[in-house]
């Protein structure tokens, strides 16, 4: 997403055939641009969140 920086990306093939990607980073607070933020089941404190937005941008670009 805009302004968000991801270290660990995962490519997911969309139904239309084009690649989309999702950030696998576990963060203490989601970036404001993230619209689908979910708390993860981790033993860490504070809690970790993952942004589940599907971003059509190339994961290699910051």
UniProtKB/Swiss-Prot annotation:
The GO terms this record gives for MF are: serine-type endopeptidase inhibitor activity
Q: Which family does it belong to?
A: Belongs to the Bowman-Birk serine protease inhibitor family.
Q: In which tissues is it expressed?
A: Expressed in bulb (at protein level).
| Cysteine disulfide partners in this protein | 5-59, 6-23, 13-21, 30-37, 34-51
Q: Which InterPro entries match?
A: Bowman-Birk_prot_inh, Prot_inh_BBI
Q: Which GO terms describe its cellular component?
A: extracellular region
Q: Which organism is it from?
A: Hyacinthus orientalis (Common hyacinth)
Q: What is this protein called?
A: Bowman-Birk type proteinase inhibitor B7
Cross-referenced SUPFAM superfamilies = Bowman-Birk inhibitor, BBI
Q: What does this protein do?
A: Serine protease inhibitor. Inhibits trypsin (Ki = 65 nM) and weakly inhibits chymotrypsin (Ki = 295 nM). Does not inhibit bacterial subtilisin.
User: What are the UniProt keywords, alphabetically?
Assistant: Disulfide bond, Protease inhibitor, Serine protease inhibitor
Q: Where is this site: Reactive bond for trypsin?
A: 15-16
The Gene Ontology biological process terms listed for this entry are: negative regulation of endopeptidase activity
